[in-house]
């Protein structure tokens, strides 16, 4: 360091090597800057107005700078002033030295990356990066070692070879893809422009306590599923279902009313009938549930004697008699069908069984028929079939039927009502005794039963018997005795002479049911369909067989023919009734018997199913005439073949299409000229074809636009151009042949027109000058024009020459 004194100035000079020293001494402060001493003296003696005059001083300092030399005292003052005013910080010596070092380091931070192929033999691309930054992620690494560590750790898909700076080159890095990376593919983050890749921020791992994994400490519980006896659970009494548990019997309330009891039931039982769930009687272990009975007789009462070992329930019967009949039941497991007695006197019922509860009886006046006309039609519209279940004990009958008061609710309900009976308990619903108008009752009840949307499927298990009602109309009935085991006696409905009117309304609706009635019988069960017996006198029927069903008999009067003419046609149109029988089960189909006196029927077969017999009156022929044709009608319409339809449609459309085309005028897509119908219907493609006539017109119009050309010259150019186009003269070797043929084609015109011949000679001279024709060709063309037409010969081009006929070149002036 040397100190020099200049006139009026005192400066300190420091070499460049002193800039690298870390300790900044006052004697070593140099920056090549020269200022007058007066300036620095003013800086040494600060005044109060220095802060306000900083800008003025800076201007004076900048004006008085000679070279980059400043005295040491100046930098001291600048450093002290920079504490109060940051503006002087950049002018201090320490700041300038750091900036110089930074600039020097930046100048040496350049490094070159050579991107080479996989075999590391050839350089594909070279790139120079400053500040030792990464070329892939643009992160400044601060030095050669930092860059080396960063590349090896963050971009391990590539292979790097580092070279230190030498005399001939600076630091370099050879980059190549590893062979292992090619097998699995190159990472997308390491390829492409890193500036376009999104920036992802990863925060530091927070020191949080790990949640304890209590999965190993959880006690494993062994789940034990225990079976529950649902029969022992208490149940409610929804929808008036009886509740029976442990020999306790609860019966529905009795309704003893006056003559206007019909008004009561019309409001109460209808609401019961609209329940959302159907009633399903459930019987277990010798329990019996019997529906109500409707007894209607005229003069005398009827006594029912039941002498069975176990519980017996008798379903209702409908009898309209002048004289009553005693029914004796001396069998095991026999259910007596329901009875409807209309009489002036009451009926006594004798039950000699164990655990039998008598159902409440509803004894109404003559208007009881009106009651049932409003209540029982609700039976008909069940959304689900009636399901009846039985136990394995014998002697359980009549558990299929429910009271007339409860059956309406069964019909419209969507789910069954469950009658639950345990341990030889009996729940019997009330009985309804109506008057002489029982026929009016059936006219409204049975049709509704037939209109059910789904079949009634009684399910019988283990030697249980279900019997459906019968309709018997007679004036005098004899006693019926049954001495058979496991034989059902179907219910009898004995009505007056108006039974025919009843069936005219009931059985047709049975036929209109949407689905067949399917009866499912298991284990020696017998299902019998209803019978309609109408006669004046009925004889006794004896059954001495085991497990033999008696088919239903229809014994009608003279009006039976009229009944069946209305009923059986509807049966024929509906779906068939399919009785399902399993394990020695017998299903009997209905019979129609019409006679004044019926004979006794003896059946002595085992497990036999008798076909239906039809014994009709004189009008039976009318019945079959209406029923059998209905059976032959198919349920589905005939469908015409689609292929045949298409063929017919195509044939019809073809004729229509041709007629429409004939009435239209078509034009060419290129020439815009009208086309004939034959041209339109031809298979030729007119889309890409060239119309010579249109091209000739366009060529003529093009030549007419020329100015300073005579008509003869235009005429000659027009003929030559269309000749070359039509004869496809496209090569130099074609020109000699074209000249000869053109002379032959227009020989006569050239002889008549001297100007035309002149232009033809001038054109041949141009062709000869250009070397397209030789002297021999030129001579041939001249001899063709001088020779006669016969000697010249015909046109040998092979194409029609009519297109080159003489055409007028007259132009409208």
Swiss-Prot record:
Compartmental location: Nucleus
Bias (Basic residues): 388-402, 472-481, 593-602
Zinc finger (C2H2-type): 134-155
Residue ranges of A- repeats: 243-264, 282-304, 305-327, 328-349, 350-371, 420-441, 459-481, 482-502, 520-542, 543-563, 580-601, 602-623
Polar residues: compositionally biased ranges: 501-512
Subunit structure comment from the entry: Probably indirectly associated with FIE and/or MEA. In plants, PcG complexes are probably composed of a member of the EZ family (CLF or MEA), FIE, and a member of the VEFS family (FIS2, VRN2 or EMF2).
Protein name (Swiss-Prot/TrEMBL): Polycomb group protein FERTILIZATION-INDEPENDENT SEED 2
Source organism (scientific name): Arabidopsis thaliana
């Amino acid at each position: 360091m040397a100190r020099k004194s200049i006139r009026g100035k005192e400066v300190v000079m420091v070499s460049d090597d002193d800039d690298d020293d870390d300790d900044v001494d006052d004697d070593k402060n140099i920056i090549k800057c020269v200022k007058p001493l007066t300036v620095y003296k003013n800086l040494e003696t600060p005044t109060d107005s220095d802060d306000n005059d900083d800008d003025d001083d800076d201007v004076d300092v900048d004006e008085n700078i000679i070279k980059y030399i400043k005295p040491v005292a100046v930098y001291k003052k600048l450093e002290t002033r920079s504490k109060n005013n940051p503006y002087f910080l950049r002018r201090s010596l320490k700041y300038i030295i750091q900036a110089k070092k930074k600039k020097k380091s930046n100048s040496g931070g350049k490094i070159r990356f050579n991107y080479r192929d996989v075999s590391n033999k050839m350089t594909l691309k070279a790139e120079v990066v400053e500040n030792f930054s990464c070329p892939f992620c643009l992160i400044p690494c601060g030095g050669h070692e930092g860059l080396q560590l960063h590349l090896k750790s963050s971009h391990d898909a590539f292979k790097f070879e580092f070279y230190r700076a030498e005399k001939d080159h600076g630091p370099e890095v050879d980059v190549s893809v590893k062979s292992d990376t090619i097998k699995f593919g190159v990472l997308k983050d390491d390829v492409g422009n890193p500036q376009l890749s999104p920036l992802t921020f990863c925060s530091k791992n927070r020191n949080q306590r790990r949640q304890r994994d209590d999965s190993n400490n959880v006690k494993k519980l062994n789940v034990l599923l225990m079976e529950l006896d649902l029969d022992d659970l208490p149940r409610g009494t929804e929808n008036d279902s009886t509740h029976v548990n442990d020999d306790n019997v609860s019966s529905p309330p009795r309704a003893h009313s006056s003559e206007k009891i019909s008004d009561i039931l019309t409001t109460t039982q209808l609401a019961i009938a609209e329940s959302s769930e159907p009633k399903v009687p459930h019987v277990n272990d010798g329990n019996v549930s019997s529906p109500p009975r409707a007894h209607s007789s005229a003069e005398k009462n009827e006594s029912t004697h039941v002498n069975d070992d176990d519980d017996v329930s008798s379903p209702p019967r409908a009898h309209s008699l002048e004289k009553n009949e005693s029914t004796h039941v001396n069998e095991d497991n026999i259910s007596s069908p329901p009875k409807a007695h209309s009489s002036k006197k009451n009926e006594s019922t004798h039950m000699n069984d164990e655990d039998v509860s008598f159902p409440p009886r509803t004894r109404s006046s003559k208007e009881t028929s009106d009651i049932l006309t409003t209540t029982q039609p609700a039976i008909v519209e069940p959304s689900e079939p009636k399901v009846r279940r039985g136990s394995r004990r014998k002697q359980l009958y009549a558990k299929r039927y429910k009271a007339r008061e409860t059956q309406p609710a069964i019909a419209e309900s969507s789910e069954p009502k469950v009658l639950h009976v345990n341990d030889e308990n009996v729940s019997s619903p009330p009985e309804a005794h109506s008057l002489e108008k029982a026929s009016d009752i059936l006219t409204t009840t049975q049709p509704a039963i037939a209109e059910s949307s789904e079949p009634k499927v009684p399910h019988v298990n283990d030697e249980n018997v279900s019997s459906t009602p019968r309709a018997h109309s007679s004036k005098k009935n004899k006693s019926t005795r049954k001495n058979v085991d496991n034989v059902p006696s179907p219910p009898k409905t004995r009505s007056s002479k108006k039974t025919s009117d009843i069936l005219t309304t009931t059985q047709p609706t049975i036929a209109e049911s949407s689905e067949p009635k399917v009866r499912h019988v298991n284990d020696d069960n017998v299902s019998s369909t209803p019978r309609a017996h109408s006669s004046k006198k009925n004889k006794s029927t004896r059954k001495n067989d085991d497990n033999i069903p008696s088919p239903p008999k229809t014994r009608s009067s003279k009006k039976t023919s009229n009944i069946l003419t209305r009923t059986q046609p509807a049966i024929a149109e509906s779906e068939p009734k399919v009785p399902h029988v399993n394990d020695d089960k017998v299903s009997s189909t209905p019979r129609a018997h019409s006679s004044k006196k019926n004979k006794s029927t003896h059946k002595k077969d085992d497990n036999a199913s008798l076909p239906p017999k039809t014994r009709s009156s004189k009008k039976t022929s009318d019945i079959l005439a209406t029923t059998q044709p209905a059976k032959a009608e198919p349920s589905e319409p005939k469908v015409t073949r689609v292929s045949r339809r298409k063929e017919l449609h195509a044939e019809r459309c073809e004729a229509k299409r041709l007629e429409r085309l004939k009435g239209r005028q078509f034009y060419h897509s290129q020439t815009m000229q009208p086309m004939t119908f034959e041209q339109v219907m031809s298979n030729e493609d007119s889309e890409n074809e060239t119309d010579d006539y249109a091209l000739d017109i366009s060529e003529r119009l093009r030549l007419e636009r020329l100015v300073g050309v005579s008509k003869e010259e235009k005429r000659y150019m027009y003929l030559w151009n269309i000749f070359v186009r039509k004869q496809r003269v496209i090569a130099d070797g074609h020109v000699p042949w074209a000249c000869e043929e053109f002379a032959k084609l227009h020989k006569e015109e050239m002889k008549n027109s001297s100007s035309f011949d002149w232009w033809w000679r001038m054109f041949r001279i141009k062709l000869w000058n250009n070397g397209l024709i030789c002297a021999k060709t030129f001579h041939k063309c001249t001899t063709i024009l001088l020779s006669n037409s016969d000697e010249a010969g015909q046109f040998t081009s092979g194409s029609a020459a009519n297109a080159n006929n003489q055409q007028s070149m007259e132009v409208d002036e």
